[in-house]
Amino acid sequence: MIIKLIFLICFKIVLSINYWVRYNDTVTLNSNINSETEGIFWNFYNNTFNTIATCGKKNNVCECSNYDKSLYNITNNCSLTIFPNNTKIFNTTYQLVYSRNRINYTINLLLPVTSPIITYNCTQSLITCEKTNGTNIHLFLNLNDTINEYTNKSFLNYYWNSSELNNIFLATCIINNTLNSANTTKVINCTNPLLKSYQNYFLENIHTLFYMIIFIVSGITISIFISIITFLSLRKRKKHVEEIESPPPESNEEEQCQHDDTTSIHEPSPREPLLPKPYSRYQYNTPIYYMRPSTQPLNPFPLPKPCPPPKPCPPPKPCPPPKPCPPPKPCPPPKPCPPPKPCPPPESYSPPKPLPSIPLLPNIPPLSTQNISLIHVDRII
């Protein structure tokens, strides 16, 4: 502090000092004036600088006048003490002026810190550590228990090197001030950042996907119904046109049918089965539509184009010369005849055996002596 004051005295520079204090704390603004000096002024800024006290130092004693002793006190080295009953001291600038030198003191409210917030972005390899509460803070970022970054600001950004760190590592954000300290630890998992980004996008837009599915299903259902209705209407129209264009039955058949229906009634015999009459669409009063001749003149059909003259036949190709006949093959020599087989000797003739004699019955007379009458047969039943 003495070195700073000597520097200010030599170069006539205004020094600014920040004080961080809590509620109901006594604040002492050190002047560190050791030499005898006259014309020491303590001022405070309220839109303009107003004088608190006018002092002078002699024989190591600082004597001041014209100041409110219920709010302030001035020590022997001309330091200003502010009592805690003054609630307007925060965010206020006090000024010490002596020997054409100036020192500005700014008093700020010191608040305790709470746990910070850690966020990360895998695609950018970025970790952000941000404070939640607290003043006059110090932020530290530890990766795998190693301090990698430090700042006095309210947030800290750090880009890690993916070649030095794995896809999964531990990040700790530490925040502290003169009152207390807090930290937050988080596991950084960037094994598949593309898949994770797709998952986040899907979770954020799941309601839009639901509405798209409903719209697609409704469109397909309506298209199917329209196709079915169109198919049925075309089929009915085609059937109606076929009935109109079909030729009427011949007159002889109609007369024959009328004759059969009116004049001759065939009564089936008891043994004849009753057969159903063949169905005819003309036995009912079905309206028959005929095409009315058009009143507009018909467009004449164009005459057919004349056939082109036939192309002349090409001249016949000359026949090739006949091939010479091959020389006849010589006949093979005849095979020698086998010697004749000798005839077998004739069989010896045996005389026939005599017939056995059958004796006649003694009571039968000979044929010549029997009376035989011829009976004429007219009918055989």
Swiss-Prot record:
The chain crosses the membrane at residues 209-229. Residues 305-334 are annotated as: 7 X 6 AA tandem repeats of K-[LP]-C-[PRS]-[PS]-[PS]. Cleaved into two fragments of 63 kDa and 26 kDa containing respectively the glycosylated N-terminus and the nonglycosylated C-terminus. A full-length 89-kDa glycosylated form also exists. Residues 256-270 have a biased composition (Basic and acidic residues). Induction: Expressed in the late phase of the viral replicative cycle. It comes from the Viruses. Residues 243-278, 341-362 are annotated as: Disordered. Residues 17-208 are extracellular. Residues 1-16 form the signal peptide. Glycans are attached at residues 24, 73, 77, 85, 91, 104, 121, 133, 144, 176, 183, 189. Keywords: Disulfide bond, Glycoprotein, Host Golgi apparatus, Host membrane, Late protein, Membrane, Receptor, Repeat, Signal, Transmembrane, Transmembrane helix, Virion. Sequence repeats lie at residues 305-310, 311-316, 317-322, 323-328, 329-334, 335-340, 341-346. It is found in: Host membrane; Virion membrane; Host Golgi apparatus. It is a single-pass type I membrane protein. The keyword Glycoprotein applies. One of its GO terms (cellular component) is host cell membrane. Residues 230-381 are cytoplasmic. Disulfide bonds join 122-190, 129-173. May play an immunosuppressive role by inhibiting lymphocyte proliferation and subsequently facilitating viral replication and generalization of infection. Responsible for viral hemadsorption, which may help viral spread. Increases virus replication in the tick vector at the step of virus uptake or replication in the tick gut. May play a role in the host Golgi reorganization to yield viral factories. May play a role in host cell penetration. The C-terminus contains repetitive amino-acids that may function as a cell-penetrating peptide. Both glycosylated and nonglycosylated forms interact (via C-terminus) with the host AP-1 complex. Belongs to the asfivirus CD2 homolog protein family. This is CD2 homolog.
